[in-house]
């Protein structure tokens, strides 16, 4: 199964992605993780991406599209994949759709974790206060969180609204508990084994 998971910062995308990929036995492909890995490896791409991520801005589309295309063609994606955090705007969506055609792939569902802006902000700011391995992510400061929320509302939400009429679009109430959100996704896509 090939899934695309949409939602704002703090919507629970990462949590649901981890659950679904375990249940389905498919890789979780996160552009954020790919970019952080490049940054940790000290690559030129990672250094370039770092400056954008630290400001809460989007990394240029072509860099992301090329990375995603390469990742979707890895051997571990044969049974499917879950793509989290991409596409993020209308331009990326158009290039992404063309890229999928060029590599002869398609997606089964566009899952949207629908969470109001005020709740997204509260969740994201709470996450920033929680350290991961004793360290806060450099892109999880209150300033960059607010910037990411603004970018989401300006760039990503209009793209999601365009996808709403797509027959594969599946809105999910993301304000519910983790378990309830997972159950709602399972009910809608119908192919995930129940826990």
Swiss-Prot record:
Q: Domain comment text?
A: Consists of three domains, a large central CORE domain and two small peripheral domains, NMPbind and LID, which undergo movements during catalysis. The LID domain closes over the site of phosphoryl transfer upon ATP binding. Assembling and dissambling the active center during each catalytic cycle provides an effective means to prevent ATP hydrolysis.
Q: In which pathway does it act?
A: Purine metabolism; AMP biosynthesis via salvage pathway; AMP from ADP: step 1/1
User: Quick one: where's region NMP?
Assistant: 30-59
Q: Where in the cell is it found?
A: Cytoplasm
Q: How does it assemble?
A: Monomer.
Locate the region LID: 126-140
Q: What is the lineage of its organism?
A: Bacteria, Bacillati, Cyanobacteriota, Cyanophyceae, Acaryochloridales
Task of the protein: Catalyzes the reversible transfer of the terminal phosphate group between ATP and AMP. Plays an important role in cellular energy homeostasis and in adenine nucleotide metabolism.
Q: Which organism is it from?
A: Thermosynechococcus vestitus (strain NIES-2133 / IAM M-273 / BP-1)
Q: Which UniProt keywords apply?
A: ATP-binding, Cytoplasm, Kinase, Nucleotide biosynthesis, Nucleotide-binding, Transferase
Which branch of life, at top level? Answer: Bacteria
Q: What is this protein called?
A: Adenylate kinase
Binding of ATP, residues? 10-15, 127, 176
Q: Does the keyword Transferase apply?
A: yes
State the similarity comment.
Belongs to the adenylate kinase family.
The EC code for this enzyme is 2.7.4.3
A single GO cellular-component term from the record reads: cytoplasm
One MF term in GO for this entry? ATP binding
